[in-house]
């Protein structure tokens, strides 16, 4: 059996007019693979632009350049990687890288400077090595070979373009050289049958489910152990999540129960208060308001009557008091007019006798004291008369009377 072909997409089939009339060709089989139908673009060999090796032109590979210097962080990571990996064997690669990144950030500037100095020194060496590399004979030979190959490819592309402009066929199909096909005297019918069976056999192999296993799907023992640890950690995490879900569900049920209890208690209290509510009769309230207004009006009328009666009683009591005061004033006036004459005559006699008796013995101080006593008595008499006149001024005005000293009254 021939080698299994690559999975290259098939090109668009050529029209039937361009199919060659070679012996052994039985129509166009759309299921045939391209690797078993030798086709060339442009009609002659050396013009296959899909693979440069088919035309005999190969672009050489450049020589290996010097390695670039490692960055300071990569130097530090390479230095402490084994230590961190040994202290944390269960962690993943990205977790170890995260730890090393934190350690690098925690370093001081002096500690980082060591790695920076190494990087700068290697960088200088790298620049010198690159200069020597670019001037090396191998690199110069690579440049020359590359330029020649590119020129040949450009020439080939120009030739292909010219052939396409002249109308030459874009694609021609030639029979493939298959070791299964051998000419042992069979007719064209047998050859076509063999080709048909071969093509179907190849198609069945291509479309079958049995493929070469991928290298990445091969699991090693170390990988299995890592996967087992990951499975265990995932199971532990799953159990934690389930426990948290149970706790959340319990708290939710507890809150729900409290809400239901509070709702029931509120409904019961509402029913009790609704049963205790008082029905308001607006007609009864209006009747009570009217009755209260009537009582208030009656009390107001009674107070007004009492005030009017008190005013009448006060007026009736004022009239006899005025009459009594007027009578008393007239009697006093009569009594004062009668003794006025006798008192005047007696006063003159007493004053003369006193003057005669006191001319030899009296002192100026005694005279002054006597005169002050007379004046004070006169003032008292006037004040008494004024009080009497003020008490009776509402009804009768009494005529002014002469003041009488108190000594004369005593005599």
UniProtKB/Swiss-Prot annotation:
One family name in Pfam for this protein? HMG_box
Biased-composition ranges, Polar residues, are 46-57, 353-363, 383-395
**Is Coiled coil found in the keyword set?**
yes
**In which residue ranges does the UniProt entry place its DNA-binding region annotation?**
66-134
Please give one Gene Ontology molecular function term for this protein.
nuclear receptor binding
| Modifications the protein undergoes after translation, according to the UniProt entry | Ubiquitinated by TRIP12, leading to its degradation by the proteasome. Ubiquitination is prevented upon interaction between TRIP12 and SMARCC1.
GO cellular component terms attached to this protein's record = bBAF complex; brahma complex; chromatin; kinetochore; nBAF complex; npBAF complex; nuclear chromosome; nuclear matrix
Biased-composition ranges, Basic and acidic residues, are: 153-168, 296-312
Q: Identify residues that carry Phosphoserine.
A: 265
According to its UniProt entry, one GO biological process term is:
positive regulation of T cell differentiation
- Which parts of the chain are coiled coil? 220-319
Tell me the keywords, alphabetical order: Chromatin regulator, Coiled coil, Disease variant, DNA-binding, Intellectual disability, Isopeptide bond, Methylation, Neurogenesis, Nucleus, Phosphoprotein, Ubl conjugation
PROSITE patterns in the cross-refs: HMG_BOX_2
Instruction: Quote the subcellular location field of this record.
Output: Nucleus
Which sites are covalently linked via Glycyl lysine isopeptide (Lys-Gly) (interchain with G-Cter in SUMO1)?
92
InterPro entries registered for this protein in UniProt: HMG_box_dom, HMG_box_dom_sf
Identify the stretch(es) annotated as Disordered: 1-23, 42-70, 153-175, 296-411
Q: Please list the residues that carry the modification Omega-N-methylarginine.
A: 4, 40
Oligomer status and interactors: Component of the multiprotein chromatin-remodeling complexes SWI/SNF: SWI/SNF-A (BAF), SWI/SNF-B (PBAF) and related complexes. The canonical complex contains a catalytic subunit (either SMARCA4/BRG1/BAF190A or SMARCA2/BRM/BAF190B), and at least SMARCE1, ACTL6A/BAF53, SMARCC1/BAF155, SMARCC2/BAF170, and SMARCB1/SNF5/BAF47. Other subunits specific to each of the complexes may also be present permitting several possible combinations developmentally and tissue specific.
Task: Give the protein's biological function.
Answer: Involved in transcriptional activation and repression of select genes by chromatin remodeling (alteration of DNA-nucleosome topology). Component of SWI/SNF chromatin remodeling complexes that carry out key enzymatic activities, changing chromatin structure by altering DNA-histone contacts within a nucleosome in an ATP-dependent manner. Belongs to the neural progenitors-specific chromatin remodeling complex (npBAF complex) and the neuron-specific chromatin remodeling complex (nBAF complex).
**Could you say which disease the record links this protein to?**
Meningioma: A common neoplasm of the central nervous system derived from arachnoidal cells. The majority of meningiomas are well differentiated vascular tumors which grow slowly and have a low potential to be invasive, although malignant subtypes occur. Most cases are sporadic. Familial occurrence of meningioma is rare.
The domain section of the record reads:
The HMG domain is essential for CD4 silencing and CD8 activation; mutation of this domain blocks thymus development.
Q: What is this protein called?
A: SWI/SNF-related matrix-associated actin-dependent regulator of chromatin subfamily E member 1
- What is this protein's gene name? SMARCE1
């Amino acid at each position: 059996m021939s080698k299994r072909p690559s999975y290259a997409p098939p090109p668009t089939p050529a029209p039937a007019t361009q199919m060659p009339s070679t012996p052994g060709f039985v129509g166009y089989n759309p299921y045939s693979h391209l690797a078993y139908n030798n086709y060339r673009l442009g009609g002659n060999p050396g013009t296959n632009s899909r693979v440069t090796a088919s035309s005999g032109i190969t672009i050489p590979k450049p020589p290996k350049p010097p390695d670039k210097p490692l960055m300071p962080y990569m130097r530090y990571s390479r230095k402490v990687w084994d230590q961190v990996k040994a202290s944390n064997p269960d962690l993943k690669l990205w977790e170890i890288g995260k730890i090393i990144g934190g350690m690098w950030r925690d370093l001081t500037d002096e500690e980082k400077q060591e790695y920076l100095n190494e990087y700068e020194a290697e960088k200088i060496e790298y620049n010198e090595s690159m200069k020597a590399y670019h001037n090396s004979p191998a690199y110069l030979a690579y440049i020359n070979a590359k330029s020649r190959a590119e020129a040949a490819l450009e020439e080939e592309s120009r030739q292909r373009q010219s052939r396409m402009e002249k109308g030459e066929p874009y694609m021609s199909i030639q029979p493939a050289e298959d070791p299964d096909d051998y000419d042992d005297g069979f007719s064209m019918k047998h050859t076509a049958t063999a080709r048909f069976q071969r093509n179907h056999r190849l198609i069945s192999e291509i479309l079958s489910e049995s493929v070469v296993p991928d290298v990445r799907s091969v699991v090693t023992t170390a990988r299995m152990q890592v996967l087992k640890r990951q499975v265990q950690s995932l199971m532990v995490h799953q159990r934690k999540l389930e426990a948290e879900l149970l706790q959340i569900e319990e708290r939710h049920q507890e809150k729900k129960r409290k809400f239901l209890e509070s709702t029931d208690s509120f409904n019961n209290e509402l029913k009790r208060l609704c049963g205790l509510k008082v029905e308001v009769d607006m007609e009864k309230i209006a009747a009570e308001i009217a009755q209260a207004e009537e009582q208030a009006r009656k009390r107001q009328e009674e107070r007004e009557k009492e005030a009017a009666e008190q005013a009448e009683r006060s007026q009736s009591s004022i009239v006899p008091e005025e009459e009594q005061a007027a009578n008393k004033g007239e009697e006093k006036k009569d009594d004062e007019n009668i003794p006025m004459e006798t008192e005047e005559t007696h006063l003159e006699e007493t004053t003369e006798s006193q003057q005669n008796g006191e001319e030899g013995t009296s002192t100026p101080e005694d005279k002054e004291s006597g005169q002050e006593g007379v004046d004070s008595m006169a003032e008292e008499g006037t004040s008494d008369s004024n009080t009497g006149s003020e008490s009776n001024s509402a009804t009768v005005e009494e005529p002014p009377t002469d003041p009488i000293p108190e000594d004369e009254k005593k005599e």
